[in-house]
Amino acid sequence: MTMCCGLWMGCSNDEVYSIVPHFSKIECQPNPVTPGDSITLTARQDQLGKLINATSYDWSFTYSYFYDGAATKDTTVYMPTVKTNYDGISNADPVIGFWVPANIAGNLTVTINAFYSLSAQTSSGQLYGQANRTNQITVNLQ
């Protein structure tokens, strides 16, 4: 008597993809903002990511300010990089605080650059590696 044993393995044609988060907007509180205010900015994700490891967020603030009376100078302030593990630690909306200088002239431009280390390819065929997203708003001052 011959005994046959078969091993059935489940196979799927479904592929595993990394999904890069997408920011819908940056919210500013309080609103309206006046020079000298301490503000909190939140980059809202309308699509969460998936299969992402190391993540870093770089925030910058660009504005003009008064010096020597009426003249203005342009400057950009770069905040320290915020690092996390997106899937392992936190996929929460990125948040940063900033004190608006009392001598600001005009509006404040806020930029967030997010860098993601992908654990799989993306559906568009991008292979493992890094992807990034940039979002920017202008905060109107009163």
Which ranges hold each PLM region?
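Surface-exposed, short loops/turns at beta-strand junctions within beta-sandwich domains
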Residues: 102-108
